[in-house]
């Protein structure tokens, strides 16, 4: 589905979710 997910389990497609610097854990 193209979503990136953070270490807290929240997912989205913006840099807030997809940036490793912001804690992205999957589909980064």
Curated annotation (Swiss-Prot):
Has potential use as a flocculating agent in water treatment processes. GO terms for molecular function: chitin binding. Residues 1-28 form the Chitin-binding type-1 domain. InterPro entries: Chitin-bd_1 (IPR001002), Endochitinase-like_sf (IPR036861). It comes from the Eukaryota. GO terms for biological process: defense response to fungus; killing of cells of another organism. This is Morintide mO6. Coiled coil: none annotated. Seeds (at protein level). Disulfide bonds join 4-18, 24-28. It comes from Moringa oleifera. The lineage of its organism: Eukaryota, Viridiplantae, Streptophyta, Embryophyta, Tracheophyta. Keywords: Antimicrobial, Chitin-binding, Disulfide bond, Fungicide. Chitin-binding protein which functions in defense against chitin-containing fungal pathogens.
């Amino acid at each position: 589905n193209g979503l990136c997910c953070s270490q807290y389990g929240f997912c989205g497609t913006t840099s807030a979710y997809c940036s490793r610097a912001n804690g992205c854990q999957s589909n980064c």
